């Protein structure tokens, strides 16, 4: 049996739809259900940020999670497939009236993605002071807490509604199929068989 960690919400539903397309039947978590067993799989319904942790530590053999989370956590896992779900960008946002000035010696940035932010600014050879927030990140430049933010952008509406604009894209992100390294070698045939089936559906729906 393969254990699959899925992030609560839309990505989990879309991934389970792929399993339904492959194996038939209905794949759904009922109500507040956190574990579901079906067709030789055990599905775990966990928080998005926790998926790669479950996979890295072997509590799940495989998982589905955004590339932004994988990049931020810098975990030792195997990336198998871009599932083309939940497409978005990680971007720098600033107030509409501001411009991003890379000549400044230091920029203060509010974000929950500390590693992505530090690494990006290091590549630009610009000092960065990171203020870690867990929500309502768009508020930070408006109240003088930060010069800019680094956040997930899908349509850009949330930034626009709060008087911000995208100054620069850092990376594209979408949901990826990942695997625990030990599981991949111990259950290689099982995992690769599932990988091929999922890949076929992703390419067909692409």
Regions found by a protein language model. Name each.
Residues 1-206:
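Domain-level signature for soluble enzymes in the chorismate/prephenate branch of the shikimate pathway
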